Amino acid sequence: MRKLIASTFASLDGIMQAPGGPEEDPVGGFAFGGWAFAYWDECMDTSASGFDGKDRELVLGRRTYEIFEAYWPYQPADSPIAKTLNAAKKHVASRTLTALGWNNSTLLQGDVVSAVTALKTQSGLDLQVIGSGNLMQTLQAASLIDEYNVWTFPVVLGRGKRLFGETAKPLALRLIRSQVSTTGVVMSTYV
């Protein structure tokens, strides 16, 4: 059975909404988009393998898919992350999209929990959810996530979409890897 790995950025108080920019996810009046960039350093560039989809198939929510699809295909061809994400097979959970324009992308059919459960039973590369907060919470509530890559940034946002929301089940996780960037970002992997 394939593993499902969830990878996300989170603030110290567990907010994962819009780390990349102010326009990324302003839902609910969230005004702090782009909070992660002030903390980026070279250590994080070399540790980005937990987020780059390398040797994995991606499982993305609609919003994350649309953000990635509008950005990564247009990055320089020599960018290792762009090259990997553009080549990766992408499974997209959406109730509204009917067609996908990014290469190697397919829509998950039917109920997302059933669709991801079926993907996990197929042979192939491990599966990775990147960002995709609503999708991640749905998959966590269904006990489908096997591993968490969480980069915790030393910032408190106070409000926004949380990594573990109201539907979260209690979890006892074990830390298997941890590294700290020069800016205080804690890059952790839990199973």
Residue ranges and their predicted role:
Residues 1-144, 154-191:
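Portal/gating segments that form or line small-molecule/metal binding sites
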